[in-house]
Amino acid sequence: MITANKGLSLVLLIPNLFALVSGGLQYVFDVRRRIFRPHFSQFWTIWMKFFSIALVIITQIYVGYKTKNIGWNFFSVVTYCFVLFLQFAEQSTLRVPMASLLIFWLLKVVTSLLILLFSPYIAITSMARLLTLITLFCSLVCFISEVYVPPCNRVWYSDDTNEVEEKGIRPSEVRYANIFSKLSFSWISSFIKFGYTNYLKESDVWLLPPDERSGNLIIGFEDWWIYHSKNKRRSLFLWKLLFFNHWKLVALITITKLIQDVLAFVQPTLIQKTILFISSYTSPNPESPSRGFIIAILVLVANFLQTLLLQQYNQLIMLLGMRWKTELLASIYRKSLLLSSSARQNRSIGDIINYMAVDTQKISDLPIYLFIIVSGPFQIALALSNLYHLMGYSAFTGVAASVILFPCNIIVANVYKKFQSILMKNKDSRSKLMTEIINNIRSIKLYAWETPFLQKLLHIRNTKELSMLKKIGFITAIGDFAWIFTTIIVTTVAFGAFIIFHGKTQALTADIVFPAVSLFNLLQFPLAMLPTVISSLLEASVSVSRIYEFLIAQELDYNGVQRFPATEIPHEICLEIKSGTFSWSKKTLKQQVTPTLRQINFVAKNGELTCIFGKVGAGKSSLLEACMGNMYKNSGSVFQCGSLAYAAQQPWIFDATIRENILFGSEFDPELYEKTIHACCLKRDFEIFTEGDQTEVGQKGASLSGGQKSRISLARAIYSQADIYLLDDVLSSVDQHVSRDLIKNLFGPEGFLRTHCVVLTTNSLNVLKEADSIYILSNGKIVEKGNYEHLFVSTNSELKQQLSEFNDEKDTQPLPEHTTSYPSTQISLAPSIHVEGLETYSSSERKDSSNKYKSRKRNPIRQKVTEDDKGKCVAQTDELVQRGKVKWHVYWMYFKSCSIGLILLYFFFIISGIMMNVATNVWLKHWSEENGKSSSELNPSPYFYLGIYLFFGFLSCAFISSSSLTMTVLCGIRSGRYLHDSMLKTILRAPMGFFETTSSGRILNRFSNDVYKVDEVVSLTFMFFFRNSIQVLFILGVICYSAPLSLLLIVPLFFLYLYNRAYYVRTSRELKRLDNVTRSPLYAHVQESLSGLSTIRAYGMQETFVEENDLRIDTNHRVWFMFFSSSRWQAIRVECIGDLIIFCTAFYGILSAIKGSPNPGLVGFSLSYAIQITQGLSFIVQQSVDAENNTVSVERILEYINVKSEAPEIIPENRPPCEWPTDGAVSFNHYSAKYREDLSFALNNINIEISPREKIGIVGRTGAGKSTLAMALFRIIEPTEGKIEIDNEDITKFGLYDLRSRLSIIPQESQIFEGNIRENLDPNHRLTDKKIWEVLEIASLKNCISQLEDGLYSRVAEGGANFSSGQRQLICLARVLLTSTRILLLDEATASVHAETDAIVQQTIRKRFKDRTILTVAHRINTVMDSDRILVLDHGKVVEFDATKKLLENKDSMFYSLAKESGLI
């Protein structure tokens, strides 16, 4: 050995042993598995390291030769040779320096410095000194090279390279960071610097590491779920899955936390050592000054190591929470695509969004508290162990006192769990109703129903949800007080026991009191956190149970339909149902269900058009759903041969461009695409739009008319190249002439789909003549089948009876010869099936078809936006993202909503509580100094001192608990109520343009996540921020009082602290805003997907939509990952400032003692507070940032509160007479209007006069402005120029409620609301049941509703899903019949109903509204042929307005051409 000192010899062994063991393990399990790619681009650094190692080896050999110490030097040479090999392997295979090499070189530097520092005190030769100097120099060179120069030039990992090329987003630096960079979070420094100087955009945020991406995480989650599916037992199974699927991370978190706890409990020991050292200077034999300085250094090192481990622990628990949330979000979405119809009826879209927005958040927050369950008992054990060594058995007596409070806390916990469960149900109810309101806002405005829906939602919100939240707040406050006061009781009892057992032999002096106080403060954390842990665990348990019940809900039976590949046989059966009986709910032992379809025998063949005909509610749409497997098959069998395309009755249009809606993930084929849009009569529509088929349609196709939506949905089906086409009444919402064009282009002798299997439900008698077979449905049964000629000549034919009822209609005329024709080239739609869980296949080419169009791979439904696409016409605006600091106005509005008086009351309570807390420690200092002074008694008047201590402690707990109750319950709930109610009222009063340009996901995000933050998070964050800020100010005051010279260090550290906060807060604030912005598209995508679930399933697009959902999850979570990583970056730097303050306090106390001014009581008092400042400073920064970030939710709510409203509901000084309008005269005077300022005129210079009781038909081609004219009458859009008068009164001078409630409308889209039938007809509850039944009989609904179990109070599912489209339209008719207005507007009211139902509506209107003014917007020209006058619109202008007869006599009129195209002439 080179030294005789055995201690240093052992120190020198440590680096070598570490290199051999750690380096060997890292090489075996990591390096050698990687691909060998020699890469020496950093030429000079690698050769510099090789040269340094070679120099050390040569020197080591030389020294060994000279000193004859062969064994030690041989061992060292072997170690360096192995290190040289590792350096070469690192350079050849790794992108990141090896952790073992970095630590080895650091240890070498430290050990070499130790040898040189202690060389005066140990025997060391000149040769050994030379070796040490060379080793130090070479180790320092290698260490610096390893840290600052990567092994090779930056080369991305392959998975990062793909992401960079596809998205242009930078990979996360954490993958390329060395171990020291990871420990200090320096890898994120460049990003924080960028955020400090730039406003962050989504594209600036780095990618997630691959292990954190949803696509990778969900694989393990699903594998675990499937593997253990047989052992699933309630929600415990999901708990096990969440933990065991990440057991390595859980184990690492636990180990890290336990080591950090040990270091935390080293502090009281060092405080005791410091006090004992200072106390020695009050005796004749003081200790050596070097011992005191070593203690001070140990204080610094222990705190620094604790800081590193604590921040690693915080990073890991956030990572675990994010993984849990990712897996749950992904699994919930995947499950929602698989839910059965009955399961969907019990879980609305609002419920599912609530699972994703609220429940997953509660579960992801749980790891913050969860590991205290392990750490807490360990901390308590350490505290009691140290207290035992400090105070003996008396330390345990205090613990017994805490046991008394356990039953109380158990009761509190049970009550809390019960209340939390009720609260979540109330949140679900509110979310569900809010979703209904947003989805049906147009109807609410047209019917002037804002007030009843407002009252209904406020009842749920204020009477139920906030009331329960207030109860939870009181219960939490009681639990908090009980557990905080436990520490005071434990301390009091322990000190009392010490006096009793040891009072006569030992004084309770500072070296016992303040270490004990520090230990009791450390003991306070697990005890004080226990209520929070219990409440968080209970909240998460409720959420886990809810999610688990959702994940095990019934799924569609994909085996209900037997699917086979398409064949080459020309007329083979493509779709067949044999003796099928179907229902929407599954029959169980407890639940008997009535089948919707009974004994269905149905066949659809290749190359044939099969039509399904029947009255409203007969089961036409249900039959198509049964063919797709979306209903429960109670008996029989269903066979499907080939791929499927589906066009729904209510067209599903997602938020993208028109082209993307048509392609729906298919490759773009210009020729096929061109023929598709011609066949679907879309060419002219594209010419209308500024951007053609690149126009963004908005959510639910907000910028499209009903006919355009239907034809785009139809074009999607045509373009998909399927074998089987299921078309659900696609002709109902298009103009009559367009309908005839579609019939010829698609179903005629040379139609586009003539060589394919087409199943069409229809109310159009015209298309039946083209059908190869017709099925007549009635009450869920097939009552007749045959072709048109067969059914028509049959004496008792159901079809013939209906035709005879309408034999006076011209709708049954043959197709006119002049209908637009298209090339007769046959287009092959090569079949391919895309059904989840089945093998993808492609049929052979049909004999009579070209093989030009093959089945195509599905692509993302939304294409990447290029620079050329920017600036295109969009239907929805980007979400507004505020920049810079949250404005002071936002804070002021929040505190104002809390009540300034209550805020001041909070400050009174918290300042008083902290003052009382300081008073308890000042009293302990005074008591400890008095003890031992008296020669006659070691501890004079102990019970007096204990009584005062207990009194101060009780006051402190009472004040602090009162402050918590004031801020969270009184302020938080008051603010939440005000902000939510104000936002709700504003949104209900917002113009329709707001909803057309704002996705429902954004709005629902405000009402779910942002309202949750305001209710439960913002007040809590401000409470902790104010509490910690005041507490730190008191601590700094104590330190400055006890160590005045520490101001010399504290003042510059304070400015460094402020700079660090300012440097960090800009990035953090922008990340938090981006987090809010990127969350909205996730919920919007969920809502959009669930709205079009049947379409997505039919096309087999589940996987594409799942990938889109995963992408949106990752987009949000890469922002969140950078947010909490940047939080760790600032915390580790701020806490280092706190560590220096603690070191300064201890060093000053030691220095003062050495210089002759020992004061152990004051030093102990100041140190007991100083050790709190590290966490305190970090908490202040984090909580100030959290306060600002969470206040962003307030800012977002205020943004919606300030949305421009419609005109007032009521203008008191301009209220119309009760009987207004008495006549029903309507006049448009030079009326012009736009939907938005940036758009062209939708109506231009309209001048018409409509007499009282006149019947006006409004016609025109698609996009002519027919529905816009109707919206203008209801002031859904406001005039840009001119005015509308009703009975000579300008309608703009009246409030909107007064106007809209005096008009009646049957809208184009029949929207009904979840609840019951009565609420849908009379939400104001003004009418009797008798009156409603009378109206239902007139509307032909009485028989249908009376058969329901609960009659008028029967449940209506979300969106009226349990009623057919025709029934929903008749409910809208019933609403009109319940009003007594003079003006009725029919906006294509019978577009989607059966001809017989159409007749019912028309006859009812003619009979019941003959003395009223009626304006009819029509697609079917025959429905307005008996109108008094016809208004023809084109491009928003009046083209013709005259009597029907006169217009028909004029063969040059547009109306004449429309009537002729419809076959009515």
Swiss-Prot record:
**Gene label:** abc3
Q: Which organism is it from?
A: Schizosaccharomyces pombe (strain 972 / ATCC 24843)
Indicate yes or no for the key word Heme: yes
Record topology, Extracellular segments:
1-8, 64-69, 119-129, 257-291, 384-394, 502-511, 921-939, 1055-1465
Q: Name one GO molecular function term.
A: heme binding
ABC transporter domain residues are: 575-804, 1226-1460
Q: What does this protein do?
A: Iron-regulated vacuolar transporter that mobilizes stored heme from the vacuole to the cytosol in response to iron deficiency.
Principal location class: membrane
Which residues pair up as cystines?
none
**Which ranges of this chain reside in the Cytoplasmic compartment per its record?**
30-42, 91-97, 151-235, 313-362, 416-480, 533-899, 961-1033
Which PROSITE patterns does the UniProt entry name for this protein?
ABC_TM1F, ABC_TRANSPORTER_1, ABC_TRANSPORTER_2
A Pfam family recorded for this sequence: ABC_tran
Matches recorded under SUPFAM superfamilies: ABC transporter transmembrane region, P-loop containing nucleoside triphosphate hydrolases
Q: Which residues bind ATP 1?
A: G614, K615, V616, G617, A618, G619, K620, S621
Q: Which UniProt keywords apply?
A: ATP-binding, Heme, Iron, Membrane, Metal-binding, Nucleotide-binding, Repeat, Transmembrane, Transmembrane helix, Transport, Vacuole
Protein name per UniProt: Vacuolar heme ABC transmembrane exporter abc3
Residues annotated as binding ATP 2: G1260, R1261, T1262, G1263, A1264, G1265, K1266, S1267
**Region (Disordered) location:** 805-824, 840-869
Topology in the lipid bilayer: Multi-pass membrane protein
Ranges for the ABC transmembrane type-1 domain? 250-539, 903-1189
ATP-binding in keyword set: yes
State the compartments where it is located: Vacuole membrane
